């Protein structure tokens, strides 16, 4: 018979992570907040869609705030206190998401805009005619 391992089944142990990085990806249609530790392993994440918003409401600043609070709460449960914020994209929820992280009790040490800017890359979508 093969030797049994000592580890019992079940959920992974929560690790204590004092500081990390929050990536906020804000598009016109949704806002995704991912909080990772310093090495890049994801601690918690939330999006406007996972917070219960559907359709056009996912692109609103309030949906971004709700998603940000949800991700921050889960990260703080694992001991996170300080974060650096990387913001990407042109969406409406950028500032609101940052404010919600601060309001949840996380100390923001750095805010950096990492939106990719093309050096004349892909052709943009055609202008809307309403």
From Swiss-Prot:
GO terms for biological process: translation. Residues 8-17 have a biased composition (Basic residues). It holds the Pfam family Ribosomal_S11. Transmembrane segments: none annotated. Keywords: Ribonucleoprotein, Ribosomal protein, RNA-binding, rRNA-binding. GO terms for cellular component: ribonucleoprotein complex; ribosome. GO terms for molecular function: rRNA binding; structural constituent of ribosome. Part of the 30S ribosomal subunit. Interacts with proteins S7 and S18. Binds to IF-3. Located on the platform of the 30S subunit, it bridges several disparate RNA helices of the 16S rRNA. Forms part of the Shine-Dalgarno cleft in the 70S ribosome. This is Small ribosomal subunit protein uS11.
